[in-house]
């Protein structure tokens, strides 16, 4: 395995776990890629939603990247506005433009985000062509848009069911930007497929966020799969002892997700 590191212009850190090329498994020398975007309320990036998640997808045969994107560490810093999305879209662009080097299929690049990182992952699919993103990256095409989106207990809305801290760190008091970042109102028919999971008992980011997204995706006929688990709270990541949230039932999301991606990408080990 190769370990890859890259620093984006903002200082955001991209790391990659890349499977080695081999003559013994030539059919798998080119693999799909997945970019992990940890949560943390846009204030930090959770380690529990980084490597433990990456290892699950690495085991499923993916080349895996993790992005530590720009965050607002305290209230003395200005709102982040578009910078996290510029970071994430820039990471997707970097993966695609280096697909041959990374032995990645450039048409099979997924993103996976949790909580605020879920908002960011969804934004890469929904707001990839927003003017601030296109201008910052110098692109006018779909190079920075993912081919599939995986969301765990995502922040979606800036409305009444929002996670206030995440939206405050992202938008501050800018009402227009808050409206733009309320993603359930930005859905359109040309989006990539979504896989979404949430717990009904989540007391931090309401399950209504995922339900609002699912409703909007349904309205616009965007393919998606939604899994709701009754018990457990927020930030459960892989639902294992390693991340201090063991739940044998809820951890089924990992297998459900890798099966969904395998069918979508026609990539079966």
Question: What does each model-found stretch correspond to?
Answer:
Residues 203-212:
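Conserved alpha/beta-hydrolase "acid-adjacent" motif
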Residues 1-29, 160, 164:
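N-terminal cap/lid segment of alpha/beta-hydrolase-fold proteins
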Residues 90-166, 178-179:
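Primarily recognizes the serine-hydrolase "nucleophile elbow" in alpha/beta-hydrolase
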């Amino acid at each position: 395995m190769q370990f890859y590191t890259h620093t984006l212009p903002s200082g955001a850190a991209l790391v990659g776990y890349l499977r080695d090329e081999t003559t013994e498994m030539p059919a798998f020398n080119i693999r799909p890629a997945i970019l992990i975007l940890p949560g943390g309320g846009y204030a930090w990036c959770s380690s529990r939603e980084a490597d433990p998640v990456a290892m699950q997808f690495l085991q499923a045969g993916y080349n895996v990247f993790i992005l530590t994107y720009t965050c607002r560490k305290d209230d003395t810093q200005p709102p982040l506005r578009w910078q996290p999305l510029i970071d994430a879209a820039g990471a997707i662009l970097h993966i695609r433009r280096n697909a041959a080097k990374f032995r990645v299929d450039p048409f099979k690049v997924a993103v996976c985000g949790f909580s605020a990182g879920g908002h960011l992952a969804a934004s890469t699919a929904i707001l990839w062509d927003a003017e601030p993103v296109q201008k910052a990256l110098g692109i006018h095409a779909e190079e920075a848009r993912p081919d599939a989106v995986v969301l765990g207990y995502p922040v979606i809305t800036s409305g009444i069911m929002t996670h206030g801290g995440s939206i405050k760190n992202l938008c501050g008091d800018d009402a227009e930007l808050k409206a733009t970042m309320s993603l359930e109102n930005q859905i359109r028919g040309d989006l990539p497929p979504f896989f979404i999971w949430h717990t009904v008992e989540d007391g931090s980011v309401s399950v209504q966020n995922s339900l609002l997204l699912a409703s909007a995706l349904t309205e616009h006929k965007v393919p998606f799969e939604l899994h709701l688990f009754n018990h457990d709270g927020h930030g459960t990541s892989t639902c294992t002892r390693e991340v201090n949230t063991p739940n044998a039932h809820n951890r089924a999301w990992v297998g459900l997700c890798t099966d969904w991606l395998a069918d979508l990408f026609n990539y079966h080990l």
